[in-house]
């Protein structure tokens, strides 16, 4: 979904060879707490330098219950970076903030309340992307970010979840009529990175599949 102006989403991830392994020390943490009295059903956390919202970070099969919380790790290229955040609850209320600043070394917490979920949520049309881990390794981080951003953004597996070999993670993506490209990166328990291109065309339906394969592994330094 295009931010503010229109619904427009498609999916594709761009791969680029790198000489360096993934470094978890580069991640910052953000925690979302639900004090609304209702279930939080979607959270979008998108780099502010992108015009697109990107995937729902909670996932197709999960919600944040009242009184609950979820923490996520975020990857961005600078000491500070701005993100746009939108959340919706089961009653159709919306929390929205733009240009929220994250700073290296400082954990952030956002608490959703009845007071700050005071707007009507937009009418989304969603596609579901099922990502399967077809490697022999446990995927510990999964990033999907709009191609027009310099940041990888948020790890869609949250702070406690992983994607073991053979397992599938379902991701909800708001879609419109246009194609939009995203970058996808997975990192395993060895901090090896897997990247590949993927395009989801809204004209072809609302259900899509992708798999992380051994051949998606980035080459090691010097290869």
Give short role names for the model-derived ranges.
Residues 94-124, 192-223:
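Extracellular beta-sheet/turn segments enriched in Thr/Pro/Gly and aliphatic residues
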């Amino acid at each position: 979904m295009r931010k503010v102006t229109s619904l427009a989403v498609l999916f594709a991830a761009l791969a680029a060879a790198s000489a360096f392994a993934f470094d978890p020390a580069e991640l910052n943490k953000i925690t979302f707490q639900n004090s609304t009295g209702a279930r939080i059903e979607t959270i979008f956390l998108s780099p502010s330098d992108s015009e697109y919202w990107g995937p729902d970070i909670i996932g197709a099969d999960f919600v944040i219950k009242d009184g609950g919380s979820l923490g996520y790790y975020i990857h961005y290229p600078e000491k500070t970076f701005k993100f746009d955040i939108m959340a919706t609850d089961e009653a159709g209320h919306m929390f929205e903030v733009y240009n929220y600043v994250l700073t290296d070394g400082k954990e952030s917490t956002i608490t959703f309340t009845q007071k700050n979920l005071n707007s009507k949520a937009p009418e989304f049309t969603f596609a579901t992307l099922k990502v399967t881990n077809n490697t022999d390794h446990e995927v510990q981080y999964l990033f999907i970010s709009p191609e027009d951003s310099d940041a990888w953004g948020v790890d869609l597996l949250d702070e406690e979840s992983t994607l073991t070999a053979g397992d599938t993670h379902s991701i909800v993506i708001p879609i419109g009529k246009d194609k939009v490209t995203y970058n996808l990166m997975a990192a395993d328990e060895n901090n090896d990175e897997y990247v590949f291109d993927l395009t989801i065309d809204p004209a072809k339906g609302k259900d899509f599949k992708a798999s992380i394969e051994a051949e998606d592994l980035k080459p090691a330094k010097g290869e």
